[in-house]
Amino acid sequence: MKHSSLRRSLLLAGITLPLVSFALPAWANALPASVDKQLAELERNANGRLGVAMINTGNGTKILYRAAQRFPFCSTFKFMLAAAVLDQSQSQPNLLNKHINYHESDLLSYAPITRKNLAHGMTVSELCAATIQYSDNTAANLLIKELGGLAAVNQFARSIGDQMFRLDRWEPDLNTARPNDPRDTTTPAAMAASMNKLVLGDALRPAQRSQLAVWLKGNTTGDATIRAGAPTDWIVGDKTGSGDYGTTNDIAVLWPTKGAPIVLVVYFTQREKDAKPRRDVLASVTKIILSQIS
């Protein structure tokens, strides 16, 4: 992912596609007219393409907007990566404590945590935390290598029923986010379903599921996106992502003070390669979606 400090930008693909494309999953609910209008107006004013998937785990209702269209996931893929590591740790109890040494040649331009720990290395658990909470690109590549390569991450996604997630390249190449490029993409609906299974369902054992939630809740990069649109007394665990074409992404589980958790995936991408990130758009989407729940 490309960064200016800890901030991020992301992508665009196929802006002229209709609001809902292809066949939506069986769980797709009709989008309330007021929400459809608000999201369409926000998307139009921001001059980009917006994808949203929300699951209210309390009553099973969903809100979907362009949720079957592909978007470049950029660093939101690191959520799936960390989950794949946790899944492997279920059969390898010492995996998270395994010590990984790496070289200066392994360091990418965005490596805030791995650079600090170059002299003595890091454990797999520490690399996962760096990947989720600081979006450290070097940590992500080291974890992919530890799992056995890109195919291992994709195989894990398939194992939990996610047929849309596809990781084709390593960091930082996966962030080019070119329009209509299917590489390194997923759909909002697929990512929301996977988050629900991994953080709130039984795709992982309780200990691993709890650890994944802890990492998400400790994220340092999402204060201006979904968290900014949620009530301040709610707990939010998220993973942001960004790349070229001003793409700005966030995927999250929100724990209200009362009621069941909410899964929310927001992908946004723009028309120009050098477009600036729009974290404000993600915050606005969150407010629109949550207004339908309260």
From Swiss-Prot:
Transmembrane segments: none annotated. Substrate binds at K239, T240, G241. It catalyses: a beta-lactam + H2O = a substituted beta-amino acid. The active site is at S75. It is an enzyme of class 3 (hydrolase). Residues 1-30 form the signal peptide. Keywords: Antibiotic resistance, Hydrolase, Signal. Disulfide bonds: none annotated. One of its GO terms (biological process) is beta-lactam antibiotic catabolic process. Its EC number is 3.5.2.6. InterPro entries: Beta-lactam/transpept-like, Beta-lactam_cat, Beta-lactam_class-A, Beta-lactam_class-A_AS. GO terms for molecular function: beta-lactamase activity. PANTHER family: BETA-LACTAMASE (PTHR35333), BETA-LACTAMASE-TYPE TRANSPEPTIDASE FOLD CONTAINING PROTEIN (PTHR35333:SF3). The class A beta-lactamase family has a specific amino-acid numbering system, sometimes called Ambler or ABL numbering and often misspelt as Amber. A multiple sequence alignment was used to derive a consensus sequence and then the consensus was numbered taking into account insertions and deletions. This allows use of identical numbers, e.g. for active site residues, despite differences in protein length. UniProt always uses natural numbering of residues, hence there appear to be differences in numbering between this entry and some papers. Belongs to the class-A beta-lactamase family. This is Beta-lactamase. The gene is blaA.
